[in-house]
UniProtKB/Swiss-Prot annotation:
The protein's name in its UniProt record: tRNA (cytidine(56)-2'-O)-methyltransferase
Function in brief: Specifically catalyzes the AdoMet-dependent 2'-O-ribose methylation of cytidine at position 56 in tRNAs.
EC class of the enzyme, as a word: transferase
GO terms for biological process, alphabetical: tRNA nucleoside ribose methylation
A Pfam match: Trm56
Length: 178
């Protein structure tokens, strides 16, 4: 079990749809297997799954989950939990330890939206900051996932998509697979 799953806490449909969609797309692009939403927002789930269908991969989204139940089940299966928060240990101070855990275990990464429930800090195995300053949760997730996987996340190949980018130094090249 070396999967990466995102748990998005407190998504507010009227306010956070775009950011939550970008959290999911960033996670997908950097190698996560799926995303759990504590809010039952089907439109965000459908939007992300449309992108996955078009561009490939097996990324999934489940909405309306209980964070306590998901964390408990994840840990029972042998995984560990990282909560991204500006109040945690700065990433350079705990990265090696987390990478060592990740060698044999899956990681659930908690990304908050609104005020994070206080029990999250105790449920997480690691409370990790990316800089101990307020900034974007999307940036924190991207930096954390890249560092966790030592840059290998950028080499992931997405199979089964309708579209594929052909890398080009100048211009744009996209091919249709169907």
């Amino acid at each position: 079990m070396q999967d990466i799953v995102i748990l998005r806490l407190g998504h507010r449909p009227e306010r956070d749809a775009r950011v939550t969609t970008h959290v999911g797309l960033t996670a997908r692009a950097l190698g996560a297997k799926g995303m759990l939403l504590t809010t039952d927002d089907k439109s965000v789930a459908e939007s992300i799954q449309r992108v996955a269908a078009a561009w490939g991969g097996d990324f999934w989204v489940r909405a309306g989950v209980s964070y306590r139940s998901e964390i408990r089940q994840w840990k029972e299966k042998g995984g560990f939990v990282v909560h991204l928060t500006m109040y945690g240990i700065n990433l350079p101070g705990c990265l090696e330890q987390i990478q060592e855990q990740f060698k044999g275990r899956g990681v659930m990464i908690i990304v908050g939206a609104e005020k994070v429930p206080g029990d999250i800090y105790g449920l997480a195995d690691y409370n990790v900051a990316v800089g101990n300053q307020p900034h974007s949760e999307i940036a924190a997730l991207a930096l954390f996932m890249d560092k966790l996987q030592e840059g290998k996340s950028l080499m992931h190949e997405f199979k089964g998509g309708e579209l594929k980018i052909i890398p080009s130094e100048h211009g744009k090249s996209v091919v249709k697979n169907r």
